[in-house]
Design a protein with these regions (language model features):
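Conserved acetyl-CoA-binding loop-helix of GNAT-fold acetyltransferases
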Residues: 118-119, 125-139, 158-166
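A short coil/beta-turn micro-motif at the C-terminal edge
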Residues: 24, 155-157
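Short, contiguous, well-ordered secondary-structure segments
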Residues: 100, 105, 129-139, 155, ...
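Conserved GNAT acetyl-CoA-binding A-motif
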Residues: 143-152
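Conserved catalytic-core motifs of GNAT/GCN5-like acyltransferases
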Residues: 152, 170-187
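GNAT-family acyltransferases
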Residues: 1-122, 185-210
Length: 210
């Protein structure tokens, strides 16, 4: 039993940007984004190594896995979504445009986690990923009282490097053979932010309010 001070589901909002759990109603939108942008995602997507022997992974499998980890307070698997009706008529069901996940949460003396993210390229370049990650960071350092967050990025993924630089994450060397990506074990550049180094609110910083 962890000492995690949250109960899933957790929903975060900053204007039209909403982090919420994926649901069954999101399956068609999720699969459409992934299929339409398969070439875009392929160089960055984690893949099961041959020794894993994993069967095809369905959307329902993903939901079950996410919900299990979240209920055990080991992950915060959010959909990055957009509210088309904000602010005059907030939507009851916001549009999926990507994902921001807090993974591998460790409690006790570590109080650490890793963050990963992706976005539909049709929505890229609007500052939505930095804002979504900032919302997640503020929640982790504020509500959860985590101490250390890590983001690991392939060296050639320039847009992702710009995200962490904008948010103030600091380089922390190379994680050798960290993830199996597109069929190969790949090194990643590591970036770290601790609660001691972070501003009171990354969302406020991005919004020009701090």
């Amino acid at each position: 039993m962890s000492d995690a001070p949250f109960r899933w589901p957790v929903v975060l909002r900053n204007g039209a940007v909403v982090l919420r759990p994926f649901g069954r109603d999101d399956e068609a939108a999720y699969l459409e984004i992934r299929a339409r942008n398969q070439a875009w995602f392929k160089p960055w997507d984690a893949t099961p190594p041959p020794e894993a022997g994993r069967e095809p992974y369905s959307y329902a499998d993903m939901l079950r896995n996410q919900q299990g980890l979240a209920k055990e307070c080991r992950a915060l698997p959010w959909a990055l979504t957009w509210d088309d009706g904000w602010p005059s008529r907030p939507a009851r069901h916001t549009r999926v445009i990507g994902s921001v996940g807090v993974n591998g949460i460790v409690w006790g003396s570590s109080r650490s986690a890793a963050i990963g993210y992706w976005i539909d390229p049709a929505w890229a370049g609007r500052g939505l990923v930095p804002m979504g990650v900032a919302m997640a960071v503020d929640y982790c350092f504020g509500r959860l009282q985590l101490h250390r967050l890590e983001i690991d990025i392939l060296h050639e993924n320039s847009p992702s490097h710009r995200v962490v630089e904008k948010l103030g994450f600091k380089p922390d060397g190379t994680r050798r053979s960290l993830l199996h990506i597109n069929g190969v074990w790949r090194d990643h550049d590591a970036y770290i932010l601790t609660a001691d180094e972070a501003p009171v609110s990354l969302v406020a910083k991005l919004s020009g309010l701090a």
